[in-house]
Every structure is written in C-alpha cells, then in structure tokens.
C-alpha cells in the first residue's frame, strides 16, 4: 500500500493529495497496490471525495487529535461515528451502494 500525503501542508510546494490521486490511480492501473490518502480528512465528506477519486481508504490522524485531547477515547469514538454518518449520507444521496462502487463521476471538479 501507499499513503498519498503532503504532510498537512507543511511543505509549501507540495501538491494536495486529492489533486494527484486520479493520476496515481491511473498509473497504478489494475495493480493490487492499495492507496490511502492523508491530509485534510476531517469529515466524512472529505473521505467521500477521496474514495470517489480512487482511494481505498483515508487516514484521519489530525482530524481525531482535538477530540482525543478534549474528550479522550469517547471523543475519538464520537468523531469517527460522525465521519461514518457523513460518509453514509453522501453515499445515499449519490446512489453509491458500497465503497466498492465509487467513481469520480459523482464529483464535479
């Protein structure tokens, strides 16, 4: 697997992961290499965009840091539940029945 990241913008010249994700997906073609996206995955809507552009999963390290510091384990659990609800909501609105049926035609960019 690979993780596509720009270290949360700390590299001023780096391209945002969602901008290059379709290209990476095309280059990898039908390979078995999984793609995970990092940086800016703070909501289920962000995860939806990444999945639609070809990611197999997302990393939410920074997105759960604040809830962890404020509420501990419960804060993280609540944040993850909210993100899952947002993702499911977007999938329902766009007719994506499961995570294997995403494609970039659901986005306009």
List where the protein language model places each region.
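Active-site entrance/lid segments in N-terminal catalytic domains of soluble metabolic enzymes
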Residues: 5-11, 23, 31
